[in-house]
């Protein structure tokens, strides 16, 4: 059996595995853990009362986080003409059309988000096998296929959490960084969960927000009391 590291021992000494924390308590614990050489993300997992095997219970969307994510994202936009100019003015890092598609096919993937104007999807559609597995394929459900590419760029740059329920019925996304205040994380979590409640499928029965877990990249998963987040505040 491998020995626990000093950091792992400290983590174990600080958490109660059976306890349900408030987000404020969880953020305090994550922020107080020994720092690593890189800035860790604060991630949230929300177990939903859905059956993702049913097409009408697949929950997918995007939330504009009030406090941002703490990370600067590089945004690529497929657009031409006035839409391309608007994307550039909004701060897009890469703007193109067929030329951008060829660059991606050649292996150039220096971006975190891909946005496309509707008329660009005939070009973007050729990239499904490249962008799809990386979670980068533009989709109208998360606002990345839109005639208003400038607004989409601004949202991505400001801090947006995209999510899609996995096979286990869980949403995973990033809502901040270690070093964020509890208030910042609470604002982001509440915005996300509010959007999730609004996205509840009509066919979903029983408790919808079943379980919430907060964690850092290399830290523990802390169970959050879900009851306060099951109804609108």
UniProtKB/Swiss-Prot annotation:
SUPFAM superfamilies cross-referenced by the UniProt entry: Ribosomal protein L1
Function statement: Binds directly to 23S rRNA. The L1 stalk is quite mobile in the ribosome, and is involved in E site tRNA release.
Name this protein carries in UniProt: Large ribosomal subunit protein uL1
PROSITE patterns, per database record: RIBOSOMAL_L1 (PS01199)
Organism: Psychrobacter cryohalolentis (strain ATCC BAA-1226 / DSM 17306 / VKM B-2378 / K5)
Keywords: Repressor, Ribonucleoprotein, Ribosomal protein, RNA-binding, rRNA-binding, Translation regulation, tRNA-binding
Family of the protein in this entry: Belongs to the universal ribosomal protein uL1 family.
GO annotation, biological process: regulation of translation; translation
Gene: rplA
This protein's record includes keyword RNA-binding: yes
